[in-house]
A protein has these predicted regions:
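Post-cleavage N-terminal segment of exported redox proteins
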Residues: 2-84, 102-107, 187-191, 197-215
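Phosphate-binding glycine-rich loops and adjacent basic patches that engage nucleotide phosphates
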Residues: 1-8, 32-44, 125-134, 160-169
């Protein structure tokens, strides 16, 4: 929890490692002067190289293995529209995950911000509105990737759920109504109404996104 000034000073005057940070910054950015902005850019570029692509799901897509029947059912539920079609036009009795966690770039995130129905009000946890000042951003938080989600408990932006079972139960319930709850949530129609075996299948699919070679 040191300040950026301390970080930059340590990088500029590092006498304890074999790395020549000023020279490395010169090679990357054309200057030996290390700044907070350039350090952030360097870290961000490194993080972008950290790509998980060897989960069971990836191997299945490459034809190297098979998903179990339960995992495949979970995948189909993941891709289907939620809700009873008699109540929700277009409903397919699915898990409705794809809207926010579709396969965009196969990172399983739309990289957007959503209110996923955790709380009825946001006085103590405002969300994106703290950044934008736009009232309709109240209670909105960024969609995380689902890769290695089985290894990343606790869940939600505030860590309120300790297991994937709790997460699935939350979405199955439809969430808590609020002024900015996402239209993809099924709070007005009693939730997704997934059966126990369907919830188990969805969780099995989420486990198939685990890539231990990446950890």
């Amino acid at each position: 929890n040191v300040t950026w000034e301390v970080v930059v000073e340590r990088l500029m005057n590092d006498d304890f490692s074999e790395l020549d940070y000023p020279q490395m910054f010169f090679d990357a950015f054309g200057t030996e002067i290390i700044t907070e902005d350039l350090t952030v850019k360097a870290i961000a570029q490194f993080i972008r190289t950290m790509i998980s692509a060897n989960s069971k799901f990836d191997k299945w897509r490459r034809g190297e293995t098979d998903l179990s029947d339960l995992e495949y059912l979970g995948y189909q539920l993941f891709l289907k529209e939620g809700g009873d079609p008699e109540i929700n036009p277009g409903g397919e009795f699915g898990a409705d995950c794809f809207h926010c966690h579709g396969e965009a770039g196969l990172q399983f995130s739309d990289y957007l911000f959503h209110n996923n129905g955790l709380d009825p009000s946001f006085e103590n946890d405002p969300g994106r509105v703290n950044v934008t000042g736009f009232v309709l951003d109240s209670g909105l938080f960024k969609t995380p990737t689902l890769r290695n989600v089985a290894l990343s408990a606790p869940y939600m932006h505030d860590g309120r759920f300790n297991s994937l079972e709790e997460v699935v139960d939350h979405y199955n319930s439809g969430g808590v109504s609020s002024s900015t709850i996402d239209t993809f949530m099924k709070y007005t129609t009693g939730g997704l109404e997934l059966a126990p075996q369907q919830k188990k299948a969805l969780i099995a699919f989420l486990h198939a996104l685990r890539d231990t070679t990446f950890i």
